[in-house]
């Protein structure tokens, strides 16, 4: 693989799984999961376009157990440099984090139960976001209460109010270029 790929960069990826996936699959009854999945898949399709979403398959692959299984059978490729960036919410207020603010405490509790720690972005524990060389989190002003999963990726332009999205993404691109 190293002859074709020099580096891989990830942002807030659940490399060691997400306790939210464990919780949803553990709490939502199996008979209800197809309906919940269809509803969320429909919403995702409306917001981002496309209809090839499969929440149930995604949740299954993102459990802490299945992530551990994947990691044990899929080692890093030699000669490829791995970099990761992450973020966390420092205060789960519903003003800055209207969608993720409710999930931060749940993910924190699940992260503690799974040995992943309490710090998280609303969906992924900070410890699970780290892979290879961890490059850190974006810089933001003192009044910002951290960056959640949607903000750091600037989904629906949610990050632009809270940090310099373009500079952050440019720094990731510059790091990838300098590690070719």
Predicted region positions:
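Helical cap/lid subdomain of alpha/beta-hydrolase-fold lipid enzymes
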Residues: 2-180
């Amino acid at each position: 693989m190293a002859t074709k790929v020099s580096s891989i960069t990830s942002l807030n990826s659940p490399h060691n799984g997400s306790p939210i996936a464990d919780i949803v699959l553990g709490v939502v009854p199996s008979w209800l999961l197809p309906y919940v999945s269809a509803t969320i898949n429909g919403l995702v399709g409306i917001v981002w376009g496309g209809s090839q979403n499969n929440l149930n398959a995604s949740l299954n692959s993102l459990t802490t157990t299945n992530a551990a299984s994947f990691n044990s059978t899929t080692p890093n490729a030699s000669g490829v440099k791995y970099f990761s960036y992450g973020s966390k919410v420092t205060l789960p207020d519903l003003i800055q984090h209207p969608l993720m603010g409710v999930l931060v405490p749940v993910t924190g509790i699940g992260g503690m139960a799974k040995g992943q720690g309490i710090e998280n972005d609303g969906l992924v524990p900070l410890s699970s976001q780290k892979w290879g060389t961890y490059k850190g989190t974006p810089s933001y002003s003192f009044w910002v209460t951290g960056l959640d999963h949607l903000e750091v990726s600037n989904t629906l332009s949610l990050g632009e109010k809270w940090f310099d999205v373009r500079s952050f993404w440019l720094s990731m691109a510059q790091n990838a270029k300098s590690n070719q």
